[in-house]
Every structure is written in C-alpha cells, then in structure tokens.
Amino acid sequence: MAADAKKETIRLTTAQALVRFLNQQYIDVDGQVTSFVEGLFAIFGHGNVLGLGEALQEDPGHLKVYQGHNEQGMASTAIAYSRQLYRHKIFAVTASAGPGSANFVTAAGNAYVNSIPILFLPADTFATRQPDPVLQQIEVDYSADTTTNDVLKPVSKYWDRIERPEQLMSALLKAFEVLTNPATAGPVTIALPQDVEGQAYDYPLSFFKKRVHVVKRVQPSSAELAGAVELIQASQTPVLIVGGGAKFSDAGAAIETFSERFNIPIVETPTGKSAISSDFPNNMGGTGILGTAAANAVITKADLIIGAGTRYTDFTTASKTAIHPGKTQLININLNRMQSYKFDAFPIVADVRDTLSQLTESLSDYRSQFTDLATIKEAWQKERQRLAHTNYDAPAYVPEVKNQFDAKTMAAYAEKLQTHLTQTEAVIAVNNTIDPTSIIVAAAGSLPGDVQRIWDPVVPNTYHMEYGYSMMGYEVPAALGIKLAQPDQESYALVGDGSFMMLHSELVTALQYHKKINILVFDNSGFASINNLQMAQGSNSYLTEFRTSDNDIMKTDFAKIAEGYGAKAYRANDRKSLIAAIEDAKKQTVSTLIDIKVLPKTMTQGYGQSWWRVGVSEISNNPKVQKAYQDIQTGIDKAFKY
C-alpha cells in the first residue's frame, strides 16, 4: 500500500510544483481550449532566484520567461497582455522580498480596479523565522507574521502566503478559480517565503493533471428579459452605454445588431471604446466628462440608459449629473451583481453578448424615436475636422483651454519647445497616419481625454485605455504587453512627458527581446492636465509646469534618451515632421520613439455634460477659488446623491 501511494506522488520543491501546476492550466471560452498561463516576468533577487529562479531555469515547460526591468513596469506589461486578449490568458510576475515586491502595489491596484487577472508571486521572509531579521525585512512590533507583502492584501482579489509546501495545493486551486471567473477576475497574490520555495514535498500526481477552466456565459433569466423588454418598449429615446465588460464579452456584433435593429444610439466608456468600429453609424463615441458632443447630446435626450458592462465611474456619469435616476431609468447588464445594482437600475446579472442577443429576439418591431442621429454625428465630425487643423500661427489664435495662459506665456512655450504644433492636430495626424489595425494605449494626463473624443478606431479592439486607475507610467510597459498579445499588429504608446518620466523601463525589455513597440511622447513640459484642473478651479499655476528654480521652462530631449537605450528615435514639431517620422517608424524592426513637442492648453476641452466634482478648498484668500467652491456646491445640489 505504502509503495503504491509513493508511486502516485512526485517529490518536488514548492517552486518546482508551482511551475508544473502553471503549465497545466487551460481555459475553455466558447469551446476553444487554450493554455491559460502564457509565461512569467521576473526580476530576481535573493528572495526568489534560488527557489523559483532555479525551478524555472531547470524546467519552465511551455512558460515563456522574460526578464523585467521594473516590478511595476513588468506587472503592467502582464496586465495589458491579459486585457488585450479579453482576459483569456495571463502572465505571472515574481520579484524579490521587500522593496521589489512592494513595487507591485500600484500595478495590483490597476488590475483590481479594471478586473484584470494577474498572478503575483512575491518572495517573502523566512517561514521558520530563524534568521530574522533578514535583508529587506520589515520588523513589525505588533505581529511577527506581517511582512511587506501584506500591503498587497487590499489590492488582491485573493491573497495567500505559503508557509508549508503542502499549502501550495489549496492556495493555487482557490487562486485559479478567481483568475478564471469573469465575475471576480483580478489580481491574485501568492507570497512565497524564500525558505519554503526550496523545500521539497511528495505532491500527489493528481494535483498536476490538466485542468480546463470553463468560462460559462451566464444567461439572463426569463424575469430579467421580460423586465428589460418592458422598460425598453415603454421608452422613446433609449441609449446604450458600452463599457469594458461588453468588450470582454466580445459583444461587438451583438451590440451592432441591437443598435441597428432598434435605432438605439451607442456611447462608449474609455474601456468600452473600440468594442465596435467608430464607423458604425449609431456609434456616437465617448461619453461623459471626456465625451464627444454627439455622445453627450444623446445622453441628455435619453429616457432610458442601458448599461452594458460598465462601472459608471464619475467620468462616465459626470459625477452623477449626466446620468440621474430621478430623470432617467436604467437597465444594468453586468456579470458582477454589485455593479448591476448601481443607480437603482433594473439589474440583469448575465453575460452582455448573450443578453443583448436575446433582447434583440424578444423586442420584435420596436424602434426608438430618435430621428437625428446622423445629423448629431455629422456635426461632431465637423468639430473633429476643426480640431485637426487648429493653427497656433493663425491670427488671433485662441487655445482650446481658454483663459489660463496669456499670449506671452504661450509664446514662451513655443520658443522654448521650438514648436507651433497643437495637441489636437498631432493626435488626429497620428490617427490618420498609422495603419488602422495598429493598437494604441493611453492612460493618464490629457491624452485620455483627447483620444476618447477625437480618436476614431475603425478596427475593433485597437483602442486600449487604462482609465480606471489612470496609472501614470502604464503606457510604455502596456505597449509591450499589447505587442506580446498581438504580435502581428503595431503597438503604439501615446504618453505625456510626465508619465514617460515616471516609468518607461520596459522599453529596455522590448529591445532586449526584439519586440517592436512605438512610443509617441507628447511633450508640453508639465503635468498639463492637472495644471488645467488647478487653474480652472481658481488656483494659480503651482508645481504643475516643468520649470527650473529660475522659472525657466524646461526642455527634455526624449529622443536622445531613447537613442541611449538603442531605439530608433525621431523629433517632430509640426505636422509634416510628425507624419514623416511615423511613416519611417513603420519601416523599422526595432522599437521607436517620436519626441513630439506640443503646446500646452491645446488639448480638447469639455463638450456638454462635463461637470466633475473635485475637492475645492472651502476657505481661501483667492476670490477665484471662492467662486469655484460655490460652483462645486451648485453642482452637488443637482447631482444624484448615491
């Protein structure tokens, strides 16, 4: 008996067992079975190089193992990879104990907010505690069981620490239920004490069997369908909001059929954008604070809002003024029950694609009363054309962001940066020049607002926006994740100078592994979007421009930085040089960077429904701030309260 039992086990270290288990995880989406864990990003230190590092070096299986260059950066690459593939595949990431693993926290927050599966494998202190305190250990007075990795608990959907080799089994089974469940997907942390990583155990062979995690499309109940049909049939001007959940559901075709059949306009959240083509006639574009005039116009007319996989963030709802249950009824389709309950909506806890398809079958001959959708969209396209040709050299030029910088300040920026290029002109020039199958990513600063309004993604799933956590520094590592996910398509990071400075280390990873990415740095020498907010709320410009202690505008040569890494770099300060740089970059096989100097205050501004509740000071000596505070109070009075 004992001998037979022995044959049914295999003696492995904890790290070896982990690697073997990862190799056996598969996912079934609509009958298509693929491996779930593509690989692992690693920055090795003393806490993981001898345990997990040795296991990967000895036998990684099919896992692709990449060396990262910043923990937050490589985790962002993993997040973008999974997001681009609708969460059907993941990367794991590992770092050493202490500061290396602490660098995961921001990325974990990003994954949590956006419901993106990623497996964090931070090294930890010794489970035995014999050598305590070890290098990079935090000694906590109230608990010897607390380490740096505990900081990952609030930003993990599941968190565990493996203090004995056999604990790995139950921990991983729970972890992969979370990682493969569309309703609960998000970051998982499995902390690995460095002594336990190398400890051996007789693991049951059954633990390493091929495991296929079936992604079930949750169907709406008959009561949910009947209730939604009744609400839609009673409405005259319904609007469909397409959120990130609709994209993850691969609901594009169902959305178009539903919209076309019933003449229902579509508006998009930042995450939902490109679920369908921008050319689709009823697609009015981005909605909310960063929305188009077309999208916000139809939202204003809506008597029913159908939310398809949206979380209703403040940027979508204009801090609950554009969407108000006291004025508009709502239907929420979401796999997450809590999300479906928002705004006192009629909840449908189900898959977006299948719910819309079944509603299409049930609504029969219904048609909305919208008669002017084409006119509304055409008017917005005319405005987009104007923004494509804004000209600083025109007589009496007025920037899009008005009444903040005077003509003298604008001239100083033009002289220092040696540019007359406006940001809207540059963004649309890029949109019109890159191949339509190319994928762009943006995340922070003023660029998310510009691309939400004026970027037209003709090809679905070519627009990758991280505006849930709006993590500065996401863009460059995300471009690499996108390239790994879609190697046959060009990947472009649209990034401001402030965000690029915060994090761009995975450009080195892209160069190291010959994965071409393209970085477009829009440099206006400052944290310009926050400067806009600061001045719009009455404050003076303060620590949001990049100026020396002598108050001189700073100019950074980002092209030279990229060249130092080994990338092909370009400089652009007008439309002609920008287009020429893009065209030449297309021909390159190495990663590229275009240093685009743009003028501040030349990004897009609000179009209707753009009130945003921010924390203006109640007491200030500045009369402009006093007025801004009163304006905020007026907005609060109009907003929905919960």
Curated annotation (Swiss-Prot):
One of its GO terms (molecular function) is acetolactate synthase activity. Its EC number is 3.7.1.22. It comes from the Bacteria. One of its GO terms (cellular component) is acetolactate synthase complex. Pathway: Polyol metabolism; myo-inositol degradation into acetyl-CoA; acetyl-CoA from myo-inositol: step 3/7. It is an enzyme of class 3 (hydrolase). Gene3D superfamilies: 3.40.50.970, TPP-binding domain. Pfam families: TPP_enzyme_C (PF02775), TPP_enzyme_M (PF00205), TPP_enzyme_N (PF02776). Involved in the cleavage of the C1-C2 bond of 3D-(3,5/4)-trihydroxycyclohexane-1,2-dione (THcHDO) to yield 5-deoxy-glucuronate (5DG). This is 3D-(3,5/4)-trihydroxycyclohexane-1,2-dione hydrolase. It comes from Lacticaseibacillus casei (Lactobacillus casei). The lineage of its organism: Bacteria, Bacillati, Bacillota, Bacilli, Lactobacillales. The gene is iolD.
